[in-house]
Regions:
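Catalytic-site beta-strand/loop segments enriched in glycine and acidic/polar residues
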Residues: 94
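Aromatic (tryptophan-biased) beta-strands that constitute blades/sheets of beta-rich domains
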Residues: 13-32, 54-75, 97-109, 113, ...
Length: 160
C-alpha cells in the first residue's frame, strides 16, 4: 500500500465523460492497480475510492482517503452496493465501509484469474475457475451463496 501512497502507478488516470454529448467532465491521476468499477456514485480503483461526479478522493471518518487494498491476488473486482468481491488467495469479500476487513468467503477455493463473481439481488455466484490452473487449490467447484432469510419469491438453487 505504501507504494501506492508514493504514486507507484501515477501514470494511470481516470477520466469521466458526459454520456449524451461525449464532453469530457473531468480527469485526474488515478494511481490504481486494477480496472476501476463504478458502484452507485463511487468509482473504486484499487486501492482508492473517488466521487463519480467530480473525481474527488473519498475520505473516511478521520478525513483520510478510503482504501481497500487486498495485499495479493490477481484478477478484477466485482461489487454489490456495499461490498467488494475479489481474489486474494481465496474467494474474498470486504464491505466498502472504512471499518470493514477483508474476509474469505470460501477458504481453499480459488476463483479464476479474471472477474468471476456475480453479486446480485443478495446472492453471490462464483463459477469454478481453477481447473487447468497451476495454482495449488484443493476445491474445484462453483459456489452460490444466499442468505437464510431470502424472501420466498426469490428463485433459489434447486433443493436435492
Amino acid at each position: 500500500l505504501e507504494a501506492y501512497r508514493r504514486g507507484a502507478l501515477a501514470e494511470r488516470s481516470l477520466t469521466a465523460f458526459d454520456a449524451e454529448s461525449g464532453r469530457k467532465l473531468w480527469t485526474r491521476p488515478g494511481n490504481y492497480q486494477t480496472r476501476p468499477i463504478i458502484v452507485g456514485r463511487t468509482i473504486f480503483a484499487e486501492p482508492w475510492f473517488f466521487d463519480l461526479a467530480g473525481g474527488a478522493a473519498k475520505t473516511g471518518p478521520q478525513g483520510k482517503p478510503l482504501e481497500l487494498f487486498r495485499g495479493s491476488g490477481c484478477g478484477g473486482f466485482a461489487a454489490s452496493a456495499g461490498t467488494a468481491f475479489f481474489r486474494a488467495g481465496a474467494i474474498c469479500y470486504r464491505p466498502f465501509d472504512a471499518a470493514g476487513r477483508i474476509a474469505p468467503l470460501v477458504s481453499g477455493q480459488r476463483p479464476s484469474c479474471w472477474i468471476s463473481f456475480v453479486p446480485a439481488g443478495g446472492i453471490v455466484v462464483a463459477p469454478e475457475g481453477s481447473a487447468g490452473c497451476t495454482c495449488p487449490y484443493a476445491i474445484q467447484g462453483s459456489v452460490a451463496l444466499y442468505p437464510k432469510d431470502l424472501p420466498a419469491e426469490t428463485p433459489r438453487p434447486a433443493d436435492k
